[in-house]
Amino acid sequence: MTAAAVAYAALGWPVVLGAYPRGNARSAGRACSCDRVGCPAPAAHPLSPAWQMQATSDPGKARQRWAHHPEANVILPTGRVFDVLDVPAAAGLAALEMMHDAGVATGPVATGSGRTLFFVATRGAPDNEDEWWSCHLDCAPEDVGEVVSLRWHCRNSYVLAPPSRDGAGPPGRWLQAPAEQGGRPLPDAVRLLEVLADACDEEIR
């Protein structure tokens, strides 16, 4: 995972050491390196509870940290450089095809652990956040509130980055890699929400 962590840091993306699968330990109820019985997110969470302070976009620091934990997954904190819209894998693939057909610009898109991740522009923590952060329409648009299978990862959250794996399936992979974006800005999340919400609704029906 070292090469992946260093590559993300070189993009200016903060990276964090992640927990990792424990071989065949799933049958014993200990599928995660954190050794917590019944871990709710096996191999899909940071190694340390201090992950927000430990996040780094320095390639040198990333290389040093993964040199000591080469098996660690790569965690990408959200709400800093990007947010992530997270939907079930099938719905995400259908939505991506619809966006391409409609000429809707998309950014990096990854898949893994039965989910599809759409990387979008972040809202970060603007100076006037107190005016809108608790507002349902701005913080969690109606589409998100009504579609329980659609998650919006923003500040204080994170996602598992390819080629990390949670032990339940194959490693994550990019459908549209960051390097393929050619310097284009990340899309506005709101522009993608309607298509993603519709795709999630179709999957549930």
Q: Predicted regions: what is each one?
A:
Residues 1-113, 123-124, 175, 179-205:
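Signature for HUH/AEP ssDNA processing cores
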Residues 112-115, 147-148:
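Short, surface-exposed, polar/charged, turn-prone segments marking secondary-structure boundaries
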Residues 118:
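Catalytic core of tubulin tyrosine ligase-like
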Residues 122-205:
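DNA replication initiation modules
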